[in-house]
Amino acid sequence: MSPMAYFQSTVLCRSVTKLCESQTRKHICVFSPRPKLKRSGMEVNMNILILSCGTRNKLVRFFKETFHEKAGKVVVTDCSPWAPALYEADAFYLVPSMKEPGYLEEIERICRKEDIDALLPLFEDELDLLALNRKRFEEQGIRAVVSDAESVALCRDKYRFFKHLEQNGIPAMFTCDSLESFDRARAEGKIDFPVFVKPVRGCGSVGISRVDCRELLEVLCRYSEEELLIQQYADGEEFGADIYVDMISGKAASIFVKKKVRMRAGETEKSVSVKDEALFELIRHTVSTLKLAGPIDMDIFRVDGNYYISEINPRFGGGYPHAWHAGIKFPELIAENLSGQANEEKIGAYEEGLCMMKFSDEVVRRV
């Protein structure tokens, strides 16, 4: 029986009714650039292995479009044959869960077989794993497209990230790490209902609840199996930023900002591109306080005309296809870095008012 798996496809339009064509810090060298490689007489930048590809069909296509032009190939892995993005790649491998013994050894085996030059993690837990094992792969000539391990850990811990923002004078929604600290902060007028309650190390919108009274807040905090944080409810507009931090210069080389119109399952389903120099500068400053590298997804709120940084996911965001179709092509920036070249800064180099609307599509095949 042929399985059917859904993935997200993207439609762009110039308006909701009409479709269209498509400060200072030291530079951080995440890896040492090396000369371009030659295989079979052709010069190429890399073969890339994308880990835990899941439903990121579009992303796999974007990398194929980029690296086929450079005589490269895109190989992917997942632990399930029901991951539709497997069937978009030049080659795919079913692997054990990343938490099982021997996972890294299996990835190394695939890298040797496919002559892989770079690894790209997409899943939260895999960011930690690859960041911590970067040197292991670099010693084999394989580069992990991932941020510094400490910065990955900080961004994944939402309370630590809030404290980092606070210590660096970056506006953020006030956050507490316990019911007791919430009660103290509320008495001091720093926070009040409604609030968001969310897992400290959650992803997407999983486990997030709006809470309007202390009774419910106490129940959630007392009986949750996960460590929770309590954050001031942001009653305003929500924005997402797709950022590329150059892996050679350590600076933000590209920023694309979209206003989120509608969310589904923690990902942006409908959005419109926007530009704001004040927001670009806030993003630059925030990035400069961390050792980030490669594709970054940032969430921002605007309340009463003021911007507040909500969180950073140091990976490709689910809404990245909007940026790609607006001409912000991170795979090309990755390829440039992997060939040993730093990218020039091009902030806001896209059309404003370009809308994205996702819809469901399917892959049907024998597995």
Tell where the protein language model's regions lie, with residue ranges.
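Short hydrophobic targeting helices and cationic amphipathic motifs
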Residues: 7-8, 32
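ATP-binding N-terminal substructure of ATP-dependent carboxylate-amine bond-forming enzymes
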Residues: 23, 41-145
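ATP-dependent carboxylate activation and anion-phosphoryl transfer catalytic cores
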Residues: 114, 275-367
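Active-site nucleotide/adenylate-binding loops and adjacent lid/helix of ATP-dependent enzymes
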Residues: 152-235, 247-249, 277
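Phosphate-binding site of ATP-dependent enzymes
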Residues: 209-291, 301-302, 306-308
